[in-house]
Regions:
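Beta-strand C-termini and the immediately following turn/loop, strongest in propeller blades
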Residues: 1, 9, 42-48, 56-58, ...
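Generic long, charged, amphipathic alpha-helical segments
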Residues: 108-128, 137
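Non-catalytic accessory segments flanking enzyme active sites
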Residues: 29-57, 62-80, 112, 123-124, ...
């Protein structure tokens, strides 16, 4: 299990690396990731049902990770940052998760962003300059929702006329200043497809489709 995080300065030898975080519990595994806005590093330490996070600014030359919320058995959470705000995806007092928002991790004045819903699994967030995309799962069906940041209006992102399908979003480019995302989906009667989708005008272009060597016609199937 990964238990330590070191700071390495490019050009220096490994023995010069500085330990900045160490997990004492053998049951927990440590990972580190860059925030969506590339302003913070988040250190995550967790086992299968409990997590704890620390953060520090990317500009810190001598990082001192700060605790976000102390671990609480059975509570999972994951914090992200975007446009001066912090978002916390957690199952604290929310069996199927919720998302809270705050302007400061020091004050932690958390307010609801996405409320928990009965028998609806709330997924995480994907950030673009003008949009926030998130997922939900209910009745074994996955859905995507897109929120316009300037208007704060949210609507379901529907890009297929099929009732039963599995959608997903992938950012294949690092540029967040765009209205275009790559959306993939598959269904019981349709092979996997990837579309380039414009969130602003809702246009889509098919860019990839799974080939079935024996041939396949979706119209021959009823779901």
């Amino acid at each position: 299990r990964a238990r330590k995080i070191y700071r390495h300065e490019i050009g220096n030898f490994k023995d010069k690396d500085k330990l900045i975080f160490e997990e004492k519990s053998e049951a927990f595994t440590v990972s580190i990731g860059l925030s969506s806005d590339e302003k913070y590093y988040f250190i995550n330490t967790s086992d299968h049902n409990t997590s704890e996070q620390y953060y520090f600014n990317v500009d810190e030359s001598d990082p001192l990770p700060k605790l976000i919320m102390k671990r609480d058995r059975g509570v999972l959470y994951s914090t992200s940052s975007w446009d001066g705000k912090f978002y916390n995806h957690t199952n604290k007092n929310a069996e199927d998760f919720k998302i809270d928002i705050t302007d400061s991790l020091e004050k932690q004045d958390w307010k609801p962003f996405i409320l928990s819903k009965k028998e609806v699994l709330i997924g995480g967030l994907t950030f673009l300059k003008n949009w926030i995309i998130r997922s939900e799962t209910s009745n074994a069906l996955d859905k995507l929702f897109v929120r316009n940041i300037s208007t704060n209006l949210e609507q379901e992102l529907i890009f297929s006329d099929e009732t039963i399908y599995v959608p997903g979003v992938s950012l294949v480019q690092r540029d967040r200043d765009t209205d275009e995302v790559y959306l993939g989906y598959s269904s019981p009667k349709t092979p996997s497809r990837v579309y380039k989708y414009n969130l602003s005008n809702k246009s889509k272009i098919l860019v990839k489709e799974q080939e079935i060597p024996s041939g396949h016609n979706p119209e021959n199937y009823i779901v």
